[in-house]
């Protein structure tokens, strides 16, 4: 296991073309208080792309409730031209339920394995990863402190219960005031308290899909408001341009729609829209790859053109007097 330098580490996958395993992983490196490793699917994961993920290798040894909000940048190095290297970046929460995350469509396998493409040289693929912590919750040191203080917590439980009985009425008053303030700042639309800025959007949703919340049985107004806000945010995410939407964003939208559907919302129409957006995203990515190839060819042709132009000008130059005599 090697220590990462400046939050970056390099993974050289040798004999890439002869790998028979479905997945392979790098040697773990230490960044912060965790061991991280890259996981690759050389034959693709449900697609014709090289899939690449970042994973917490020692997540089972971390304390319960641990979370790491990480900026993850991965680059498939083009060993012939640095400018043609493929890079993707994301920011994600890693936790006990999701210790790994990454890019399902990192690079087309046909482009990766292309002869003289620059990504596969002498049977080797080179990947550079960068991991940056944005927020850390639950460290090993905190876990030890919790264990040491458990006896004190047990001894004070009886007193805490007595205090709780005194505080509860005040908490109830504060909570009631908080809910009342939220309701005051909200507007009712079809039984949902929504922010003034979302009123028009929610009304349009119910106008086009009046049965969207028929199966949603939650009565608590705070939860109803949260779910509706969640739905509006999902739709607003899908309204972003393809350049702003990453493949990971689309995966998150897919998960969010499943969550809403499980809660009782009818979102089949949104699922169809999502499929359409995914198709457009795939076409965009394929088009960009083709465009990149055309631009490279154009660059080479322009270079040849300039060279030939110089030759023609040189040949067409008039003879000097001394050249004739």
Curated annotation (Swiss-Prot):
PROSITE patterns: MATH. CDD domains: MATH (cd00121). The keyword Iron does not apply. It comes from the Eukaryota. Keywords: Coiled coil. The keyword Cell membrane does not apply. Residues 6-131 form the MATH domain. Residues 266-315 form a coiled coil. Gene3D superfamilies: Apoptosis, Tumor Necrosis Factor Receptor Associated Protein 2, Chain A. This is MATH domain and coiled-coil domain-containing protein At3g58340.
């Amino acid at each position: 296991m090697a220590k990462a330098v400046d939050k970056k580490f390099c993974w050289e996958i040798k004999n890439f073309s002869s790998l028979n395993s479905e997945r392979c992983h790098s040697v773990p490196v230490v960044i912060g208080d965790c061991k991280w490793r890259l996981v690759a699917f050389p034959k693709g994961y449900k697609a014709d792309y090289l899939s690449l993920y970042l994973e917490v290798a020692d997540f089972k040894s971390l304390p319960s409730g641990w979370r790491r909000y990480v900026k993850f940048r991965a680059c498939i190095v083009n060993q012939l031209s640095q400018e043609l290297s493929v890079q993707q970046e994301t920011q994600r929460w890693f936790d006990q339920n999701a210790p790994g995350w990454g890019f399902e469509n990192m690079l087309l396998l046909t482009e990766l394995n292309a002869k003289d493409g620059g990504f596969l040289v002498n049977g080797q693929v080179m990947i550079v990863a960068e991991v940056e912590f944005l927020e850390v919750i639950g460290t090993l040191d905190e876990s030890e402190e919790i264990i040491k203080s458990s006896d004190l917590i047990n001894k004070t439980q009886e007193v805490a219960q007595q205090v709780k009985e005194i505080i509860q009425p005040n908490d109830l008053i504060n909570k009631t005031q908080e809910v009342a303030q939220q309701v005051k700042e909200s507007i009712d639309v079809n039984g949902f308290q929504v922010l003034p800025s979302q009123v028009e959007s929610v009304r349009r949703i119910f106008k086009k899909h009046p049965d969207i919340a028929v199966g949603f049985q939650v009565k608590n107004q705070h939860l109803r408001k949260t779910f509706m806000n969640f739905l509006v945010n999902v739709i607003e995410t899908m309204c972003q341009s393809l350049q702003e939407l990453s493949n990971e964003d689309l995966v998150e939208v897919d998960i969010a729609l499943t969550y809403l559907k499980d809660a009782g919302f009818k979102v089949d129409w949104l699922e169809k829209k999502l499929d359409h957006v995914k198709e457009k995203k795939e076409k965009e990515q394929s088009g960009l790859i083709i465009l990149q190839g055309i631009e490279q060819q154009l660059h080479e042709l322009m270079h040849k053109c300039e060279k030939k132009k110089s030759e023609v000008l040189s040949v067409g130059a008039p003879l000097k007097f001394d050249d004739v005599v």
